[in-house]
């Protein structure tokens, strides 16, 4: 937490029932997949992580996710994959997500698209599962509307999705552009979910905190990918577009890959962070 940001006092019961969650920020291209492959297992084992959630929407060359890449991330230890505005960039993911029924716990059911997409959109915006320990958990995926493509209201979508979730431990990936919109959702859901973590901007924010109701919040977890880039893309291509105003093809960068992730410790009985 930030210096000066007070920590909540934990009871003995909360410490005994503690659960650690790792959320890995937007995996960008082959460099992002490589750094996750090299470091995720060590991070999980050394920190006694029980639940791993990865945002995979940029994992296929920076644009979307394929079934093969999704399976690879599940093999590396992900329990659930979240996405965002690039979810449909690789069309084959649609059939993958629809290959199992809604009540399945197989891998295709555990990759989410934003839950505030219009009714009838393929896939699902939330998932509820059970860890080997018996601990129930849920993950909700939402997308912002400020400076983003049109979608339904994420606040009301969160209310609707929560009606069907019985787990106490609930993580929300809010894939959004505006800091204000992310903060607003964090406060709106404070005390009702375990964590609201922002994705999409690829820049990790230093505002991680636990809100008064026990909900962990961070504006953006950041990108797991090439830091020698402009948010994952080759620098020269982005600079050309800014300097000339002309269209430019964006290719994934490869240099200096780093993994950005946030760990949350919560009480498994109450869901409070």
Give the positions of each predicted feature.
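Short, low-complexity intrinsically disordered segments enriched in A/P/G/S/L with frequent Arg
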Residues: 3-10
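Acidic, metal/ion-coordinating pockets
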Residues: 12-273
């Amino acid at each position: 937490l930030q210096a000066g940001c007070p920590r909540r006092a934990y009871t003995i019961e909360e410490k005994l029932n503690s659960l650690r969650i790792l959320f890995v920020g937007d995996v960008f291209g082959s460099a992002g997949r490589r750094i996750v492959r090299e470091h995720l297992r060590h991070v999980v084992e050394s920190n006694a992580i029980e639940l791993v959630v990865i945002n995979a929407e940029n994992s296929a060359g920076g644009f979307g996710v394929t079934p093969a890449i999704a399976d690879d991330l599940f093999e590396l230890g992900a329990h659930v994959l979240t996405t965002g505005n690039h979810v449909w960039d690789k069309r084959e993911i649609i059939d993958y997500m629809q290959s199992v029924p809604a009540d399945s716990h197989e891998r295709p059911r555990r990759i989410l698209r934003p839950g505030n997409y219009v009714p009838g959109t393929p896939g699902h915006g939330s998932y509820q599962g059970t860890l080997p320990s018996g601990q129930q958990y849920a993950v909700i995926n939402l997308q912002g509307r400020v400076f983003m493509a049109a979608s339904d209201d994420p606040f009301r979508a969160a209310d609707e999705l929560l009606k069907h979730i019985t787990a106490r431990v609930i993580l929300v990936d809010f894939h959004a552009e505006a800091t204000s919109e992310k903060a607003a959702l964090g406060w709106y859901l404070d005390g009702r979910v375990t964590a609201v973590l922002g994705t999409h901007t690829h820049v990790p924010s230093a505002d991680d905190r636990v809100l008064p109701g026990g909900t962990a919040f961070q504006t953006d977890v950041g990108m797991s990918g090439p830091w020698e880039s402009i948010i994952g893309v080759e620098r020269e291509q982005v600079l050309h577009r800014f300097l000339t105003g002309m269209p430019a093809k964006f290719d994934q960068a490869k240099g200096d890959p780093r993994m950005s992730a946030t760990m949350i410790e919560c009480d498994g009985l109450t869901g409070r962070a």
